[in-house]
Amino acid sequence: MARKYAKRSKSRPRTARRSPKSRSRPRSRAPRRKAPSRPRIQRVNPVRRPMNSTAAQSLAIYRNPFSHSPGQPKIPDGKAIMSIGSKVQVSAQLLNKASGDDILHVFLYPGLTQGMVVFGDSKEQGTRGFTAYGYNDHMTYDASSVYNAGTGADGNIESNDNINEWRLVSQGLKLSLLNTDEENDGWFECVRYKDALRANEFAFYSGDNLEQTTATVFGPDITFGSTLLTKNLVNSPTYVSGALEDIDKYEFKLQAQSEQHDFKRIPDRWYTEHGVDTVTVSGVNDYVTLQADTAQAHSIHNSLVDDSFDAVYIRIHCRTNSGAGATTGSKLLAHLVSNQELVYDEDQNEHKFMTQAAMAKAEFMKANEMARKSQVGADMIGNVRSGVRSQRRPR
């Protein structure tokens, strides 16, 4: 059988068969020029310097008056180079008195000599109408010359301490019900009080209901209480109410009104030239009320009250207290804490104990802004813990 294909000649060289794809490519070409690439921008996270430990401790106390931070209570805003941080406290039992409407009125305010007055307490004596809880061994005033001079007379109110300047760092109150489960009925309501505290609503009087005119404190008097006790609270945007048995879940804290916390300068004495409105001398009822719209009254008020903070008013609706049997009222344990920053003159003995204040103004401004934003809500009268929510209006 004849072969179908002729035998390939050996003299002709065999070439490799190219694929159709390879045939279309040119045998030689110039190298492709790459387009210039843009420089790659690498994002670098900013490196934050760690905050000074002393400043962090001070901010912890500024945010929470009950903080267990080991540092001194100071505001790290750079307004004081050297100062002393002081923490003063009051622990007392509150009980609604047998005669009355079974309501305890607790008012917290940013004061130097004391920070809480209670209306309707069983410890009221005489006709004063309220109980004053002053800080023990902390900034009292000798008003004996004014007491002896009488109403409208001249006299000196002298300081018993050597504090030159002061300002409030933080202040708060905790309340705990001491009654048993069978006697824990009752409720409370509270609001923030941001109105300007007028000077004529304050007075010098003896603290802790003691009869003394040489060591008085400065705080709200009965005139201020008479206008507040009957005020309708429910329409306030900061209104909060709750069961009395859950009051220990709340921390009532004064909030800053601005980021400016200026020091209050305290003179050694005030000369009250016709600046005394009322002088009542009757046992524990001793008090000196200042006249309204006088230079002395405004000077004293501006020096002893830090108006950069607001106030808190708590109205507690207690059990009936008949004084006998099972109706013995509502007993509450009050724990008040006031953190203050103090400055002394060079000639005072306390001056050598002053320490350098920390500086963290940016962190302080941020903490202050967050605190002021949080107080807008009605439930921010204090920190609500353990899942207990307040009875508040819907937003």
Curated annotation (Swiss-Prot):
GO CC annotation, single: host cell nucleus
Chain ranges for the short sequence motif Nuclear localization signal as given in the UniProt record: 2-9
Chief subcellular location: host cell
Entry keyword set: Host nucleus, Virion
Stretches the record annotates as Disordered: 1-51
Subcellular location as annotated: Host nucleus; Virion
Basic residues: bias regions: 1-41
Primary role: Self-assembles to form the virion icosahedral capsid.
Protein name stated in the entry: Capsid protein
Native species: Chaetoceros diatodnavirus 1 (Chaetoceros setoense DNA virus)
